[in-house]
A protein has these predicted regions:
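Intrinsic low-complexity, intrinsically disordered segments
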Residues: 88-117
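Helix-loop-helix
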Residues: 9-76, 118, 232-235, 246-269, ...
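Soluble non-transmembrane domains of integral membrane proteins
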Residues: 106-378
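Secondary-structure junction/capping motif
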Residues: 92-93, 285, 383, 405
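Short extracytoplasmic/periplasmic juxtamembrane "stem" segments immediately C-terminal to an N-terminal membrane anchor
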Residues: 68-91
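Aromatic/His-enriched, Gly/Pro-containing loop or helix-boundary segments
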Residues: 33-37, 99, 197, 211-212
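Short hydrophobic transmembrane-like helices used for membrane targeting/insertion
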Residues: 2-5, 26
Length: 597
């Protein structure tokens, strides 16, 4: 947030017309040094306030505070204590974990998209490895950054894992029955199918069975080629001589730790979410669950539940139209469960009833998520500019379908945005060009009224009116670009489709910073060219700031996604060409006027 605000104010300072004209609109009597001290204090207050807002925003999204966090030793101690929580078997109460991480006997299933690990205990899923998504190295370990910092890329990063119970991590999916002494995720199931590899087949079924409390439960997990969803069918057979009405639950449990590979430069949301027709998408933080302050729809007959992290999601999509009770639980300090509880219809003696749900565990590919369940695509986090980021992503995706390269799609997007804003931008650049023409007259006024600030301001405003110059017109092209810039920032950060997307030569991931800082350096060069085309400031301090800004902001852009820098670089190049053409046109018009005289 601080960097983006600096980018905004920095561009305004680099635009000398804005810098000059804002000063002419401010009537001040303080000395130059007094103004500079006040300005410095205001910047300190601004940055301090923005940093505090940023830190609180990170904590709100489930991240850690810059000022410290709970010690891991305490977390591990509380997690161990949570393992002894007794299992609840009453309606509207979530079943608890007896042991979150102990795997009785792993059973590994392999498809063309993922490797899924089951545990016989509860036929629960304790591992899901994304075969097409390798874990990314931290950007500080590669390219020029790695050379300067003396860091080597982390070896054997492997693939991205969602469900996982290794290395002190706990993240798993469970189902079971409550309402009696029935099979839950804490009871042993028997594997009755033999096929554990998809191979050349289009689909494959993995079947588990368990008998307890007079019920025979058969869980059938169906895997399909090219699909991250798992169809889960739970068949319940009543082997007693009395009718029963059990309840089935679908549950996700995990700790609050950040996923492996999370960038140290920004924090993204990690935590549970619910979706219902009544309240739409509702994100919950782990702290809200711990403090029993989570707000969500508990009783409904629709929707889904999920665990969300950067670029990936795991979600239970139960059958729509069936009444269910959503719940959350804090199992100790660092284990959390979210789930939904559905009452089955009465099962007569000897009868069987089957309940169907889908477990999705994979990337946040928006087209897939939209097809799977209403609102599931909302797990893609575009921040508070979602209303603008969504159409930008749609346009980017459309352009990618044409050119087949996300980098060139960003270049085309920039050209389209520039064309749409051309009328306003042209007016702004014409205003800057006229300002350049009257700069000598402005200097004369400043010399004439150097001891009378109020009269100087009046004279300058009269000059603007006579020459038909908008004092802040040159700011409009930049101001209009800022929302697009911010929205594209969220698109690049939140869209898994751009994860690992190559452009040309050294740019192998548009969602990560440029490893060799070539794009930020080129952006600085274009900013210098823009300065040369702008009117020169009359204030010496502004002149110094103006020439320093390109260097400062190019360094800041070292940590921004390469795709974002590519957008701004392309925008600068187009702006230079547009401003040069307008300056040339105005010079020719002025020459014609002088010739007529």
């Amino acid at each position: 947030l601080v960097l983006l605000v600096q980018r905004l104010f920095g561009d305004l300072l680099c635009n000398t017309q804005c810098a000059q004209n804002f000063q002419t609109l401010i009537n001040t009597q303080e000395s130059f040094m007094g103004r500079e001290v006040q300005r410095a204090l205001l910047w300190v207050i601004l940055f301090g306030s923005l940093f505090m807002l940023w830190d609180n925003y990170q904590v709100w999204k489930g991240g850690e505070s810059f000022f410290g966090s709970v010690k891991q030793e305490a977390i591990e101690a509380d997690r161990s204590a949570a393992a002894g929580v007794p299992t609840a078997t009453v309606a509207k109460t979530a079943p608890a974990l007896d042991d979150a991480t102990a795997v009785k006997e792993p059973i590994v299933v392999t498809t063309d998209r993922m490797k899924v690990t089951f545990d016989r205990m509860g036929a629960r899923i304790v591992g899901s490895e994304m075969l097409l998504f390798p874990q990314q190295a931290d950007w500080t370990e590669v390219g020029l950054a790695g050379m300067v910092l003396g860091r080597e890329p982390s070896p054997n990063l492997g693939n991205v894992k969602l469900f996982d119970v290794e290395g002190g991590h706990a993240y798993l999916a469970q189902t079971g029955l409550v309402g009696g002494d029935y099979p839950t995720h804490n009871d042993e199931f028997k594997l009755v199918s033999q096929d554990l590899a998809l191979g050349d087949k289009e689909s494959m079924k993995v079947v588990f069975e368990a008998d307890k409390g007079g019920l025979k439960v058969t869980k059938t997990f169906t895997f399909k080629r090219g699909y991250y969803g798992i169809d889960v069918d739970t068949a319940v057979t009543n082997t007693t001589d009395k009718a029963v009405t059990p309840q089935i639950y679908y549950q996700l449990t995990r700790d609050s730790s950040k996923p492996a590979g999370e960038s140290s430069m920004y924090s993204t949301f990690t935590g549970p979410a619910f979706y219902t027709d009544e309240e739409n998408f509702q994100k919950l933080s782990f702290s809200e669950i711990r403090d029993k302050d989570a707000k969500y729809v508990e009783d409904t007959n629709n929707g889904w539940l999920a665990m969300v992290q950067h670029h990936f999601v795991s979600a239970w999509v139960p059958p729509q139209g069936e009444v269910r009770h959503n719940y959350t639980r804090a199992l100790g300090h660092d284990l959390f469960a979210v789930g939904t509880l559905i009452s089955l219809k009465e099962i007569a003696p000897g009868a069987t009833q089957t309940n169907h749900a889908v477990l999705y565990s994979g990337p946040q590919e928006q087209a897939r998520l939209e097809q799977l369940a209403p609102g599931l695509e909302l797990v893609v986090d575009y921040g508070w500019l979602t209303f603008l980021a969504k159409p930008i992503y749609w346009l980017l995706d459309f352009l990618y379908g044409i050119v087949g390269n996300w980098g060139w799609a960003i270049v085309l997007l920039t050209c389209i945005v520039k064309a749409v804003l051309y009328p306003i931008s042209a007016a702004g650049y014409r205003s800057m060009a006229r300002m350049k023409e009257v700069t000598p007259r402005l200097k004369a006024l400043q010399e004439k009224y150097k001891d009378d600030k109020q009269r100087l301001n009046q004279a300058m405003m009269e000059l603007y009116k006579t020459e038909k110059i908008n004092p802040v017109g040159g700011c409009l092209p930049i101001m209009l670009q800022i929302p697009v810039f911010l929205a594209l920032y969220w698109v690049l950060q939140g869209s898994v489709e751009l994860r690992g997307a190559e452009w040309i030569l050294w740019v192998h991931d548009l969602a990560m910073p440029d490893p060799w800082f070539v794009l930020p350096a080129l952006m600085a060069a274009t900013m210098f060219l823009q300065i040369l085309l702008n009117p020169k400031p009359t204030d010496p301090m502004q002149a110094k700031v103006m020439y320093i800004m390109p260097v400062v902001f190019s360094v800041m852009f070292f940590i921004f996604a390469a795709g974002l820098v590519l957008y701004w670089l392309t925008n600068n190049i187009l702006s230079i060409a547009q401003q040069w053409w307008i300056n040339k046109t105005i010079a020719e018009e002025r020459a014609q006027r002088l010739a007529k005289r």
